[in-house]
Amino acid sequence: MKTVKRPGVLAATTLIAAFLLQPSLGATAQAAAPPAKKEGYSESFRGSQRDNVEFQKIAPFKVFDNLYYVGPGFVSVWLVPTPEGAILIDTAQEPYVDHVMASIQKSGFDLKAIKYIILTHGHLDHFGGAAKIKEASGARVAALEEDWRMIESAGTTPSRGNAPPPRVPKRDMVLKEGDTLSLGGETLKFYKHPGHTPGSLSIEFTVYDNGQPHKAFVFGGPGPRGGVSGGEQFLASMNRVAQIPGIEVAVNVHSWLTSYPYPNGGILERAQKLAQRKPGDPNPFVDAASWRQWVKMAQDGAAQNLQDEKQKAAK
């Protein structure tokens, strides 16, 4: 994919311990009901507090020099700033889209600086805010062909309770396996990893921690969708992911992965550790061992899932 040069992004203000992730993220969350005793903090956002809108509105935080978390608690939205503009990975859904846009601005960036919105897959919690953020920013929206079809179909299908269909973004860019996108010195490499959806998109890029580079990876669909076909696709995708060398940072699409929970803490547990980090301490998001452990867990789980799906289909 052709390298794109765009106008600059506003300089980021340092997000010091204003978000103080202990025991909760932000004043609204502190006033909310505590998570169930047996839940971890990240897990609570997809468990007991899944429908608690105010609890979900966590404060944004900086993870690396060039990576910010700007989503609600249950589903990730990642901002990748560069000197020539910013890239947004996923958008969350209503009623959280205004919160996402406010979080981008609180992190020191103008919405107009967003040049690209990359959608990891065609589920509403990941693409639901894309149309509104595109309208506010002028960004181009990108996804794989198979999930563009899912997104466009959702725009003509009534929502739950016969509510109107969600707003869907205009198709700007159709990504393919092996494509790259370059902006302001940052290059994203794209992979097609179906299984969660037919066109789940993964992303490889470099993050910097006080100038030190680390290989980061977004696995766009971390769980099988069901059925033999989905199970076969997911297992094949996990086996391909396992062959990608040198991944140190998992940029997960949910704070807590329900199918195969991420070992040694989800996004928000790691964010708590990051808020308490002292000079010279390692960044808790740089954790190649946990990535390898999770990949093996997901491979084993995918193999078992496929066996189970085949047994169901044979009945």
Predicted features, each with a name:
Residues 288-315:
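C-terminal regulatory/interaction regions
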Residues 11-24:
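Bacterial N-terminal signal peptides
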Residues 22-33:
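Signal peptide processing junction and immediate N-terminal pro/mature segment
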Residues 53-107, 111, 202-223:
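Conserved beta-strand hairpin/beta-sheet module of binuclear metal-dependent hydrolase folds
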Residues 33-36, 43-47, 56-57, 62-64, 86, 93-95, 171, 180-182, ...:
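Metallo-beta-lactamase
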Residues 1-6:
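N-terminal secretory signal peptides that target proteins for export/translocation
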Residues 67, 95-98, 105-180, 270, ...:
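Active-site HxH/HxHxD metal-binding segment of metal-dependent hydrolases
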